[in-house]
A protein has these predicted regions:
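Short cationic amphipathic helices and targeting signals
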Residues: 66-73, 116-122, 159-164
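Short, extreme N-terminal leader segments that mark the start of a protein/domain
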Residues: 1-32
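Short, charge-patterned binding micro-sites
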Residues: 41-72
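Short, low-order "capping/linker" segments at domain edges
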Residues: 106-123, 198-209
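Short, intrinsically disordered, mixed-charge
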Residues: 28-40, 83-91, 178-185
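Ordered, amphipathic secondary-structure segments that act as subunit-interaction surfaces
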Residues: 62-114
Length: 209
């Protein structure tokens, strides 16, 4: 059991420069940078503990921003984090523009996700998806069909379904869709297996958190 009183959480906002390291490689590079730093980061089985979040479009400066939560086992001043990580991240095309210590229990950057991706298998349907994909949420019945942002055939009678979380207008339903590993749609025999949380970059492409 993790004692939250001994863990300190910092949210860093990075600005992406031209020629920057691709976002899908950023997590590994961040862990490598932390390993070579003097910072008291929190360990996990896979290395320094961090969570990479979705990007954000900065329209005034036309540059992508990226959030990351990093966990430390000791309270540390924000400027020391920037001092240790700043130049190394800049070499990879990212500049730190904001560092803030936040409460340990504050929602992770994962909560910045706008979409959730499901794989549907098997498809007990003929032809297109029905107009109603009903899901029971407590005392409510939600039609997921209304919130589908994208569909993609994967072969082997499987499809990929992307659902827009913010369109649901219910924090409870959003949280459930983000956390439940599997959903079963009423009356269709369709089972949805959660694959990933997604965000959409400035080009409109979906990227995994």
């Amino acid at each position: 059991m993790i004692d939250s009183r001994q863990i300190f959480k910092y949210r860093i906002k990075l600005i992406k420069q031209a020629g920057a390291l691709p976002i899908h490689e950023l997590r590994v590079k961040l862990q490598e940078i932390l390993l070579n730093s003097k910072l008291p980061f929190e360990w996990t089985k896979s290395g320094p503990r961090l969570v990479l979040g979705p990007g954000e479009k900065q329209t005034d400066i036309q540059s992508d921003c990226q959030y990351v939560d990093i966990y430390f086992n000791r309270d540390i001043r924000e400027h020391l984090i920037e001092q240790e990580l700043g130049s190394l991240l800049q070499a990879e095309g990212y500049e730190i523009i904001e560092t803030e210590q936040i409460p340990y229990n504050l929602c992770s950057v994962e909560s910045l996700a706008k979409y959730v991706c499901y794989e549907a298998s098997p498809i007990a349907l003929k032809g297109d998806l029905p107009k109603e994909l009903l899901m029971q949420v407590n005392d409510k019945v939600v039609n997921l069909r209304s919130f589908i942002k994208g569909l993609k055939a994967l072969g082997d009678n499987k499809i990929e379904i992307i659902i827009e979380l913010s369109a649901l207008r219910s924090i409870g339903i959003e949280q459930m869709l983000m956390k439940l590993p599997c959903l079963e749609v009423k009356s269709t025999g369709l089972k949805l297996k959660r694959k990933a949380l997604l965000w959409q970059d400035s080009t409109g492409a979906f990227r995994q958190i």
